[in-house]
Amino acid sequence: MGALSSRVLRPAGRTEQPEPTPGAGGAARRSDAGEDAGHSFCYCPGGRKRKRSSGTFCYCHPDSETDDDEDEGDEQQRLLNTPRRKKLKSTSKYIYQTLFLNGENSDIKICALGEEWSLHKIYLCQSGYFSSMFSGSWKESSMNIIELEIPDQNIDIEALQVAFGSLYRDDVLIKPSRVVAILAAACMLQLDGLIQQCGETMKETISVRTVCGYYTSAGTYGLDSVKKKCLEWLLNNLMTHQSVELFKELSINVMKQLIGSSNLFVMQVEMDVYTALKKWMFLQLVPSWNGSLKQLLTETDVWFSKWKKDFEGTTFLETEQGKPFAPVFRHLRLQYIISDLASARIIEQDSLVPSEWLAAVYKQQWLAMLRAEQDSEVGPQEINKEELEGNSMRCGRKLAKDGEYCWRWTGFNFGFDLLVTYTNRYIIFKRNTLNQPCSGSVSLQPRRSIAFRLRLASFDSSGKLICSRATGYQILTLEKDQEQVVMNLDSRLLIFPLYICCNFLYISPEKRTESNRHPENPGH
């Protein structure tokens, strides 16, 4: 129902005129009766005070009478065109109060969850649920009292109150804490407008406290756009804003999607993804743990160390307790973990990942290294999106404030020592060969290519994306010690802290036949 109100906008530059008063227009009138009653005086500059008739004729200026008449006419015209604002009582509010809250002239009663609502069929027909009920051959179409069965445990009395009330008013205020219950009621009653409003409320209020509940509810009630938005939030925040509370709530199925995605906003390197998974698995197994994020890794390592002593010779993911988590760990890109010596040692010592998984990846990387050294491998020459999505190196960096930064990500990258610089709003890639020290071997080939994608993002306090830039997948060919600007940032879009995430592919994918493809192998 639309609220009735009258609102007319004034022309620009025009102010509301005051009500006309006696003597307006510049003529001064005496308030006392006497010989001057009905007359006025002229106070023209340089002239004597002269008595004037009620016609306000000025002998100093014979044309003044005509001017005054014209001014008075203009004034009246202005008054006629000056809007007057008068707020009318809202029809919508009247209907909501009188018909819904007071139940006046009700022709049907709806009973549910021990509560009763005195409503009106003509309003209920806005609901697809009741429209079908009243227009068909259902026995309820002729009943004055209808008992509703509520099979959905998310629906409560308050949610039904909001859902029924939405039929009698234009706008509904929805609290984020109540949106799931209201959505459930709206879906049951087939209230499309309310369902849409619930969806918008959910998308606007995604946070660490709401994201998992919203994701589950969006899947239950078919809000694909909300589900997609929640997944995007998780991809952006899982690693950048780690949370004990979030780790506890994330299900195995959701975590599998996140870890398998090339859009996961990784901070540092793939080893940090493994560490996050280890902490998440501990909290899934010990949900009663209530320490801080700083304490979490230490407690996690202690817990798994105790387990390791009891199950010597068996990796955790091979046990009955660990098997449910194996599908998530399979999505780790282990080739970028074992390429760093310190990380390789940790993953061996933890005894979480089956040795067969690691053996397959060691073999794969050894053969790739031989190709790079002996087969004139110069890197990817074309965009292979499938390979980039599934096997690219994921890494990132947080820039706390504006300034100059230069860094490299650790690990063996087939002789391509990539230096990344941020300075003066530019991001620069440099292929280092001889100019700067490098801990590993460096390829001296004249040219080397890499496939990459660069993404930048800033987030507000709730983890919502407030600005972002991305390059898309590209091929970059660099000569020895050559550097290249890969992104120039608009200072207006720079909001710190700034998060940088990259995907890299340093060598072209090996041509594999169907016979040697192994989907269960995490290295492929």
From Swiss-Prot:
Residues 106-176 form the BTB domain. The keyword Transferase does not apply. It is found in: Nucleus matrix. Pfam families: BACK, BTB. A motif (Nuclear localization signal) lies at residues 47-53, 83-89. InterPro entries: BACK (IPR011705), BTB/POZ_dom (IPR000210), Gcl-like (IPR043380), SKP1/BTB/POZ_sf (IPR011333). The modification Phosphothreonine is found at residue 66. GO terms for biological process: germ cell development; regulation of DNA-templated transcription; spermatogenesis. One of its GO terms (cellular component) is nuclear matrix. The modification Phosphoserine is found at residue 64. Its main location: nucleus. Keywords: Developmental protein, Differentiation, Nucleus, Phosphoprotein, Spermatogenesis. Residues 65-74 have a biased composition (Acidic residues). Residues 1-37, 63-83 are annotated as: Disordered. Ubiquitously expressed at low levels throughout development and in adult tissues. Interacts with TMPO-Beta, TSG101 and TFDP2. Interacts with EMD. Possible function in spermatogenesis. Enhances the degradation of MDM2 and increases the amount of p53 probably by modulating the nucleocytoplasmic transport. This is Germ cell-less protein-like 1. It comes from Mus musculus (Mouse). The gene is Gmcl1.
